[in-house]
Amino acid sequence: MRILLVEDTEDLAEGVIAHFARGGVVCDLAPSVEAARDARAVQVYDAVILDINLPDGSGLALLRDMRGAGDRTPVLMLTALASVDDRVTALDQGADDYLGKPFDQRELEARLHALVRREAGR
């Protein structure tokens, strides 16, 4: 499995990447919306883990662009914005799941695997 992690907090990103690597998951890092667009232009991903607040824009804008282009890649929002309104907004705009920070790596992994299994069953 290959995933794209769109996250600008370096220590958090390193922890997620290390956790997934132990399970054999390849995790590419994009620290900005622009870097995520560039990565997606040259690589197909099984899933995207997406922060909302990024240095060059909103992860929600990237999500809207993906869904507007018909991209059905599973997207799990991983963000400190964890109010009910934040979760509902992201889910309404096409996110497949939402996990607030702080989080447990095991839950992130379980949710991600569930999304990929669900997409594979379509």
Predicted feature residues:
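N-terminal/domain-start alpha-helical segments
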Residues: 1-122
